[in-house]
Amino acid sequence: MTAAYLPSILVPIIGIIFPGLTMAFAFIYIEQDQIN
């Protein structure tokens, strides 16, 4: 029963949080590169 609800939870996490983390790490890397 709970397995049917897993995709509705994993898809937003992969589609929203993962790109958000990628952009955050890219932003931090660029900011550190500019400071140095």
UniProtKB/Swiss-Prot annotation:
One of its GO terms (cellular component) is chloroplast thylakoid membrane. The chain crosses the membrane at residues 10-30. GO terms for biological process: photosynthesis. The keyword Transmembrane helix applies. It is found in: Plastid, Chloroplast thylakoid membrane. Keywords: Chloroplast, Membrane, Photosynthesis, Photosystem I, Plastid, Thylakoid, Transmembrane, Transmembrane helix. It is a single-pass membrane protein. Pfam families: PSI_8. Signal peptide: none annotated. InterPro entries: PSI_PsaI, PSI_PsaI_sf. May help in the organization of the PsaL subunit. Belongs to the PsaI family. This is Photosystem I reaction center subunit VIII. It comes from Guillardia theta. The lineage of its organism: Eukaryota, Cryptophyceae, Pyrenomonadales, Geminigeraceae, Guillardia. The gene is psaI.
